[in-house]
């Protein structure tokens, strides 16, 4: 047909040493006002423009390391740490040694964070010490709650440190070639959850009056919740604090900086534009204009959201008219990005986007991919002009070439192809032709890689065409790419959108299990079981839904440990060596699966391979646990233990560990 041309539970007291050691993986920190996206680099005019063919433009592949050196340095310089270092306690205090240790851990970690841009820092002992000091500081914080030594300054500096750690951890995740499995005990996942638990703990202590914070601490606390995509928790914290009668609690949360964080969140939560404006004026009154940057940024975002573009431009002009270097780079960048991504006036948004691309700004501009994605969505929502969407995507891709991690491209491409398949949902012939052109053109910008094809493969299932899926699979070989376990999961999962035999699904499942074994997994992960589920019972469930009402195709995948902080990383694929299917592919016989009932196939596979579950809880979750979402599977679940699977072949496995005793404790 077509062929291509070319929130989990953590022990609060500690983080395992082996996970701290994992922090030696590269840290590409960045200054980001958004959760999952920044390419903090300086660009030359040559790297911005496209070539004559409309796709051209390639970055300097050797320059990113030097540019990355300044990422966290820039971020660290812009951090609000407070002007005064906490006054040391009296040597006669019984808490003296613990307070000194607390101050030392916080200070040394903040200093280490300032060095994360250096080329050798990520692999040095200091990287491990940075994360270890954070956990030790939190342990001492809990012990010092009984004392009177946790001053506003100390608590605020601790929150500054935790916020910096959150940014560094997020930057690491953005730089990964592959996002962690949702059931894996990855360092990034563990630290994200640990940091969230720490923020939550301190916020409760603040509200309970056990500790107080300065406005700097309130800023970092609220901003951290926002960056974790936990707007409701930020709003609840702010409303509770500002309505409190406890002394010293209202003032720091009503300071212009924390309120600047809250204005857009409050507006999104239902506060009217007039009410937000009144709060803005209240906080602004009597303040030095040079101290209102964060507040003004928040109000500009609200104006753009409400369509008050003239007011937003006026506020921006006020900021730009302030003298000298009184306005931080982070503020100017944040305002510029707000106009790109949050302005509904496409002409105005495009002007800001073009100026950022060309460097025609009096300040250094770093375009965050989240703002570009918002612009793409706004263009499509308002005009459905795909050519305009394509133009912005192409130019943004040229901008990021050689300057950004894989996660940035995966995030941008995911949004672009989401829109692409909306346009061509009902015209796969024209869509496939255009897709071939896009892939060829993209290969001129940067080499087609596995994550790029994974995204296409994931989204092309709306066409429900097995031949297209297989042709896309062939493109991995065309572009000389090895399929990782992520690709194997996607291919199995895609079987839930097309008419295929159980024999074909079984074949895909065996390849996935063998791949898991080949890369060293010791148990079959949740993501692997989810792919099997979506290919089998998910297929039946979707057909039942379509029989009752027309509904958009949405091949859903749920993970029990879903975490927005991980999801925001949005990078898929890894460059593992591929595993040949081998003899087992040829040995499959039609009588292995006696029926084409996909529900029965699912439970038979679980019965055969369930011995490779992580534990009994996982086994119960993938059997009895799915009956609530898929009631039609209850019959099979009830008869699960009596199923005969002796006719199903078991491939030779090396690393997966059999736990046959799981079935003994199943009941």
Swiss-Prot record:
GO CC list: mitochondrial inner membrane
GO biological-process terms attached to the record: sporulation resulting in formation of a cellular spore
Main location as per UniProt: mitochondrion
Membrane topology of this protein: Peripheral membrane protein
Post-translational modification (record): Phosphorylated. Phosphorylation promotes binding to RNA.
Keyword flag Transferase: no
Family label: Belongs to the RMD9 family.
Its biological purpose: Binds the 3'-UTR of mitochondrial mRNAs. Involved in the processing or stability of mitochondrial mRNAs.
Name used for this protein in its record: RNA-binding protein RMD9, mitochondrial
UniProt lineage: Eukaryota, Fungi, Dikarya, Ascomycota, Saccharomycotina
């Amino acid at each position: 047909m077509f062929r291509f041309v070319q929130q989990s539970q953590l022990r609060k007291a500690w983080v395992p040493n082996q996970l701290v050691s994992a922090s030696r993986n590269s840290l590409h920190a960045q200054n980001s006002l958004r959760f999952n996206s920044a390419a903090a680099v300086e660009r030359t005019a040559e790297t911005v423009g496209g070539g004559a063919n409309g796709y051209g433009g390639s970055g300097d592949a050797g320059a990113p390391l030097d540019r990355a050196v300044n990422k966290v340095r820039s971020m660290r310089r812009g951090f609000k740490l407070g002007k005064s270092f906490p006054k040391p306690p009296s040597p006669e205090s019984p808490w003296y040694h613990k307070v000194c240790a607390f101050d030392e851990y916080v200070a040394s970690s903040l200093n280490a964070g300032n060095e994360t841009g250096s080329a050798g820092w990520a692999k040095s002992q200091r990287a491990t010490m940075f994360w270890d000091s954070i956990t030790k500081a939190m342990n001492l914080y809990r012990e010092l709650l009984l004392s009177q030594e946790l001053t506003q300054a100390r608590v605020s500096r601790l929150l500054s440190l935790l916020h910096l750690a959150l940014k560094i951890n997020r930057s690491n995740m953005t730089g990964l070639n592959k996002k962690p499995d949702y059931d894996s005990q990855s360092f990034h996942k563990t630290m994200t959850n640990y940091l969230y638990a720490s923020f939550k703990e301190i916020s409760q202590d603040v509200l309970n009056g056990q500790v107080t914070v300065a406005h700097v601490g309130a800023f970092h606390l609220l901003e951290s919740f926002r960056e974790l995509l936990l707007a409701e928790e930020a709003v609840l914290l702010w409303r509770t604090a500002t309505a409190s009668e406890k002394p010293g609690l209202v003032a720091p949360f009503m300071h212009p900086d924390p309120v600047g964080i809250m204005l857009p969140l409050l507006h999104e939560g239902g506060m009217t534009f007039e009410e937000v404006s009144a709060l803005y004026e209240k906080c602004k009154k009597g303040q030095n204009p040079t101290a209102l940057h964060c507040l003004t940024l928040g109000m500009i975002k609200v104006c753009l959201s409400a369509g008050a573009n003239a007011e937003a431009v006026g506020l921006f002009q006020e900021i730009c008219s302030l003298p000298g270097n009184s306005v931080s780079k982070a503020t100017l960048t944040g305002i510029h990005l707000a106009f790109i991504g949050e302005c509904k006036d496409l002409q105005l948004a495009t002007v800001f986007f073009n100026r950022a691309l060309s460097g025609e700004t009096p300040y250094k501009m770093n375009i965050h991919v989240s703002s570009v994605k918002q612009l793409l969505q706004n263009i499509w929502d308002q005009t459905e002009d795909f050519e305009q969407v394509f133009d912005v995507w192409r130019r943004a891709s040229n901008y990021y070439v050689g300057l950004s991690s894989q996660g940035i491209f995966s995030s941008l491409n995911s949004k672009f192809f989401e829109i692409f398949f909306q346009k061509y949902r009902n015209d796969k012939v024209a869509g496939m032709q255009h897709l071939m052109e896009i892939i060829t053109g993209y290969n001129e910008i940067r080499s087609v890689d596995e994550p790029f094809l994974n995204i296409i493969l994931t989204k092309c299932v709306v066409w429900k065409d097995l031949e297209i899926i297989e042709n896309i699979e062939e493109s991995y070989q065309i572009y000389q790419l090895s399929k990782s376990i992520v690709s194997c999961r996607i291919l199995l999962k895609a079987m839930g959108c097309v008419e295929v035999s159980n024999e074909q699904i079984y074949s895909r499942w065996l390849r996935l299990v063998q791949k898991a074994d080949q890369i060293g997994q010791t148990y079959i992960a949740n993501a692997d079981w989810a792919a099997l589920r979506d290919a089998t019972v998910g297929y039946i469930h979707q057909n039942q839904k379509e029989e009752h009402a027309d509904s958009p195709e949405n091949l859903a995948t749920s993970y029990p440990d879903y975490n927005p902080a991980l999801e925001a990383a949005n990078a898929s694929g890894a460059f593992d060596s591929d595993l040949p299917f081998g003899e087992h592919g040829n040995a499959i016989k039609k009588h292995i699966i006696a029926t084409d009932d996909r529900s029965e196939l699912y439970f038979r596979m679980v019965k055969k391979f369930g011995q490779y579950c992580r534990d009994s809880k996982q086994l119960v979750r993938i059997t009895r646990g799915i009956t609530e979402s898929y009631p039609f599977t209850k019959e099979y679940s009830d008869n699960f233990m009596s199923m005969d699977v002796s006719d199903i072949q078991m491939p030779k496995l090396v690393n997966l560990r059999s736990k046959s005793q799981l079935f003994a404790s199943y009941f």
